[in-house]
Amino acid sequence: MDHLLLKTQTQTEQVMNVTNPNSIYIKGRLYFKGYKKIELHCFVDTGASLCIASKFVIPEEHWVNAERPIMVKIADGSSITISKVCKDIDLIIAGEIFRIPTVYQQESGIDFIIGNNFCQLYEPFIQFTDRVIFTKNKSYPVHIAKLTRAVRVGTEGFLESMKKRSKTQQPEPVNISTNKIENPLEEIAILSEGRRLSEEKLFITQQRMQKIEELLEKVCSENPLDPNKTKQWMKASIKLSDPSKAIKVKPMKYSPMDREEFDKQIKELLDLKVIKPSKSPHMAPAFLVNNEAEKRRGKKRMVVNYKAMNKATVGDAYNLPNKDELLTLIRGKKIFSSFDCKSGFWQVLLDQESRPLTAFTCPQGHYEWNVVPFGLKQAPSIFQRHMDEAFRVFRKFCCVYVDDILVFSNNEEDHLLHVAMILQKCNQHGIILSKKKAQLFKKKINFLGLEIDEGTHKPQGHILEHINKFPDTLEDKKQLQRFLGILTYASDYIPKLAQIRKPLQAKLKENVPWRWTKEDTLYMQKVKKNLQGFPPLHHPLPEEKLIIETDASDDYWGGMLKAIKINEGTNTELICRYASGSFKAAEKNYHSNDKETLAVINTIKKFSIYLTPVHFLIRTDNTHFKSFVNLNYKGDSKLGRNIRWQAWLSHYSFDVEHIKGTDNHFADFLSREFNKVNS
């Protein structure tokens, strides 16, 4: 039995002419062949499971007998039968067509009741003080102003009066609201903002912020499987390449202190129901790590060594987003909010067949995961797929990288709506967020390891901390690889990085025995000394003209992306990115002109996401490149490389500006930066 609170016809006359002033009424419009447009005040009732309309607002020929009459409960506790329905009716709201599959006929004293089935069909449904919002076709929001006064037009004779060429006078509308709600626009000074706001606008803003807090509270928990909030819609499966194999790795030895810590953590995991005792033939050892992050939070982290299992299972090829692509989405945005999924992977349930593959050993015994554990190679792709499925429709103002969600907007007004829509979607899917990691309405925010601030970006402070904490004397190749990995992570912010890395990179060759000399220690000290801070780089806006400047030497190439910012008639060139690399062995034998051309090509490849499909400027001190672009090669096999390069460059739109070597400040800058390290 569908549950729907309605008034009886008798009650309608007695009660429904007065409604609660906080009721939600919006304007709606119906069109029927042979009739004038029918404008209605629709009541949005999320407590009603169905859409209900009066027989006096929809022509009789559009009503049909229901295949199965339904029973509904009304306000006095009794039940009535509804047997008439209207199929696939189009309700026009705020100029948008909303198709309703089924509308039921019942006299409630209101012309049209929009029930919860409509709200779910066009979710997320968001209510603010002055408006409601539906998402049309789940792709863009439709703002609908609330009415401060509502009337009923559907009475005897109304439809006759609405027929085209009808001379019947339309009946007088019946008021169904207590009174018109009026809020005088008395302005008050907001000194901290340096501007003036009306009391009404201030009240509305406060109400919206309160709504955001309420929505955030609904989706936050310390338990990633909170039974009151999760919908358990994210599921995953893992398969062995050879199902007949048992993957076993021998257990580890544990100190008394570690045994005590394991005892606490295993109990916590059992209480959360993310693990359970296992009889699996598979086995991987668990161990504890206590790195900087763990020391900051005061708790060691349990890790399972799934290296053998990862080799034995089928991978997931779903791509993680390209970080540069994500950053292009936020160009020019002024206000940000970010959210972190609580223990993200643990929100994905494993099917029963996959759970034994996650079995691990620890001092307390043999356990397996009910959820996707950290350490499985498939975990990031599995989680990204689910998050993309949930948030793809909001790509214009939201991006997701695994378990990090960033919302970005041009102004606070838009941002209130955008954040509300994202939190509503989390609530709908049961995606649980960490409240302590939520950052709301920030002009400066951390995302993807970057500090984003007023159109600039740079690596977060902990990147420099990691670099400086490395010892000057490294113990082995693994430690050197970690150090070079951090430098590579920050490569966009370090000019001529390839040259800086080269002496250290040479030590990682397989045929070179490990040896760390006093000279290596001095070089390491100089590298760290010259990386005391990363410059904030400009995030180019779509309308700004872009420039690439390049340089090549015998062994290396370098490039820089710049943007021309126009401010009060003055052009300023701002640095956006650096790029560098080493020439391959064969390329080192190229003529210097070809190396300069290759430097241009490599730089364009590095910054292609910004250079497609815009028109940009290439600036170089190489006189050959400008003529090379316009040369007409005639298929000489010796010039095949040049023909290929010309064809590749033809896909881009650019001008070439030659500058004198003495004016090439970029090349001077690169040389100066490199010489600092080598001096």
UniProtKB/Swiss-Prot annotation:
Any one GO BP annotation for this protein: proteolysis
Catalytic activity: DNA(n) + a 2'-deoxyribonucleoside 5'-triphosphate = DNA(n+1) + diphosphate
Name listed for the protein in its UniProt record: Enzymatic polyprotein
GO molecular function: aspartic-type endopeptidase activity; endonuclease activity; RNA-directed DNA polymerase activity
Domain notes per entry: The polymerase/reverse transcriptase (RT) and ribonuclease H (RH) domains are structured in five subdomains: finger, palm, thumb, connection and RNase H. Within the palm subdomain, the 'primer grip' region is thought to be involved in the positioning of the primer terminus for accommodating the incoming nucleotide. The RH domain stabilizes the association of RT with primer-template.
Presence of the UniProt keyword Zinc in the record: no
Assigned protein family: Belongs to the caulimoviridae enzymatic polyprotein family.
Enzyme Commission number(s) from the entry: 3.4.23.-, 2.7.7.49
Keywords: Aspartyl protease, Endonuclease, Hydrolase, Nuclease, Nucleotidyltransferase, Protease, RNA-directed DNA polymerase, Transferase
Residues annotated as signal peptide: none
Pfam families registered for this protein in UniProt: Peptidase_A3, RT_RNaseH, RVT_1
UniProt function note: Encodes for at least two polypeptides: protease (PR) and reverse transcriptase (RT). The protease processes the polyprotein in cis. Reverse transcriptase is multifunctional enzyme that converts the viral RNA genome into dsDNA in viral cytoplasmic capsids. This enzyme displays a DNA polymerase activity that can copy either DNA or RNA templates, and a ribonuclease H (RNase H) activity that cleaves the RNA strand of RNA-DNA heteroduplexes in a partially processive 3'- to 5'-endonucleasic mode.
PANTHER family (alphabetical): POL PROTEIN, RIBONUCLEASE H
Segments for region (Protease): 40-130
Domain Reverse transcriptase: 272-452
Positions annotated as active site in the UniProt record: 45
CDD domains to which the protein is assigned, alphabetical: retropepsin_like, RNase_HI_RT_Ty3, RT_LTR
